[in-house]
A protein has these predicted regions:
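P-loop (Walker A) phosphate-binding loop of NTP-binding proteins
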Residues: 48, 76, 178
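Conserved helicase ATPase motor motifs in RecA-like P-loop NTPase domains
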Residues: 167-183
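Walker A/P-loop
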Residues: 40-59
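A short helix-turn-beta junction within AAA+ P-loop NTPase domains corresponding to the substrate/partner-engaging
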Residues: 187-200
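Pre-Walker A (Motif I) flank of P-loop NTPase domains
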Residues: 38-45, 69, 170-171
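SF2 helicase/translocase NTPase motor core
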Residues: 9-21, 54-58, 65-164, 198-247
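Conserved pre-motif I regulatory segment
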Residues: 8-44
Length: 247
């Protein structure tokens, strides 16, 4: 994706501090992410650890904040300090001049109906009002929706039903160095957050002959066959040859 393809590239985000701290590959990634968020409503940034996923995501956040859209960062509590620092009026914040204003909440907050998360009163929070949700460590949502024996929805289902489906159109940016654990359905479940669990909506956009569900079912079948090959044959190149073009 070139800079010429960036939608509404007149809001000044390329003059931001965070944009000018990015390496070229991060700028390319940010532009591609914005394009995919607008076209498909979701994107997974799956760069390896140490390649600056957070700063790339912050540039994307700056783009949407400059459009006066509301942004939520959902992260594990152990990762919250950095996200909070980058939007705070702190001397040690290298991005203070960008005045980022996104909200930061924890994955576990999805299961809470009251109490405070930082300064946020969860009993009053309008979860459905966010235009962009950035999910750090999105692989924590790889198992999809479920209901436990007590009839309580898990965090994935709460994310879908409290944040993504209701209210404003919600774009979903997922960050993970390991989006797939040991099955392709891990990836499908995360992507389903972008199409609100309605895979037919993506089939038309992707211009494929098969549904997303069938594509992933076939890919998982090929992966299972590949995993049973002799070690000398179990190469990345062989897996790529076995997977369908649609995947």
């Amino acid at each position: 994706v070139s800079e010429d393809d960036l939608p509404s590239d007149t809001n000044g985000f390329k003059e931001s501090i965070v944009w000018n701290k990015l390496y070229t590959f991060q700028k390319d990634a940010a532009l591609a992410i914005i394009s995919k968020l607008e076209q498909f409503n979701g994107c997974i940034l799956a760069d390896s650890v140490g390649l600056g996923k957070t700063f790339t995501a912050l540039a994307v956040i700056k783009y949407y904040e400059n459009r006066n859209l509301r942004v939520l960062v959902l992260c594990p509590k152990k990762l919250s300090d950095n996200w909070i620092t980058y939007k705070a009026n702190y001397r040690n914040n290298p991005l203070a001049g960008d005045r980022l204003r996104y909200d930061v909440l924890y994955h576990t907050d999805l299961s809470r109906e009251q109490g405070f998360s930082g300064e946020t009163d969860l009993s009053k929070l309008n979860w459905a009002a966010y235009d962009l949700v950035v999910i750090d460590e999105s692989h924590n949502f790889r198992n999809g929706g479920d209901v436990d024996d007590d009839g309580k929805s898990n965090r994935y289902t709460k994310l879908m039903n409290k944040v993504i489906r209701p209210g404003a159109r919600t774009r979903v940016l997922m960050l993970s160095a390991t989006p797939v654990n040991n099955r392709f359905y891990d990836l499908r479940n995360q992507l389903a957050l972008a199409y609100e669990g309605n895979s037919s909506a993506w089939k038309d956009k992707l211009d494929t002959n098969r549904s997303v569900e069938k594509i992933f079912r076939s890919a998982q079948k090929q992966f299972n066959a590949w995993s049973k090959l002799a070690p000398s044959q179990r190469t990345t190149e062989q897996l790529m040859r076995m997977l369908d073009f649609d995947f």
